[in-house]
Amino acid sequence: MKILLKKLHMENFKKTKDQTIDFGHITKISGQNAVGKSTVADAFMWCLFNKNSLGEAKFQVRPLDAFGNPIDHVEIKVAVTLDVDGREYELTKTQKQNWVKKRGAMEATLQGNDNLYEIDGAPKKEKDYKAFVAEIIDEDLFQLLTNPQAFVSKKWKEQREELMKMIPGVDNDTVIASNPDV
């Protein structure tokens, strides 16, 4: 399967108010520290897997004000356009705050965030969206291909399992038979 990242659009994602990146076969993203390079990778991973580029599920996606406080009442949106074997798909994740005004209360209170998902503009349930993404690429494999720390951060047994998946058909008996000193 051939997968190409064609476009990434971010709205109110971390420090990025509104940005679209059109990707070519080679796209260079560079800059000084703290200008948003990792934000691009985080947005991509958040849209596909609900994690940042380090594989962490809990991280701040909401933009912050000058004092480091989350900015409320803004919609966070990331749209990714992928070419999968010649067919384009647009995957979109939007996060909205759930504000509820209880009876008798003067102000609404934040009751959490709602994540909304779309594939090619059609709303999808989270499980259907995740299943669609999983058909394109396995999250663990994607982490191994894109994050140099993904493999070394695994426990040795998990590392061994990953290596054995990459070289199928080799079992312990074959290895032992090939080397009499083992």
Residue ranges of each PLM-predicted region?
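Alpha-helical scaffold elements adjacent to nucleotide-binding pockets in ATP/GTP-utilizing enzyme cores
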Residues: 40-43, 92, 128, 132, ...
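A short beta-strand motif that forms part of the nucleic acid-binding face
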Residues: 23-25, 94-97, 167
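Pre-Walker A-like glycine/lysine-rich segment at the N-terminus of P-loop NTPase domains
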Residues: 1-47, 143
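Conserved ABC ATPase signature
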Residues: 30-35, 39, 116-126, 155
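Post-Walker A helix-loop "phosphate-sensing" segment adjacent to the P-loop in P-loop NTPases
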Residues: 47-57
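Nucleotide-state sensing region of NTPase/ATPase domains
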Residues: 57-144
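Extended, Lys/Glu-rich alpha-helical coiled-coil stalks
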Residues: 142-182
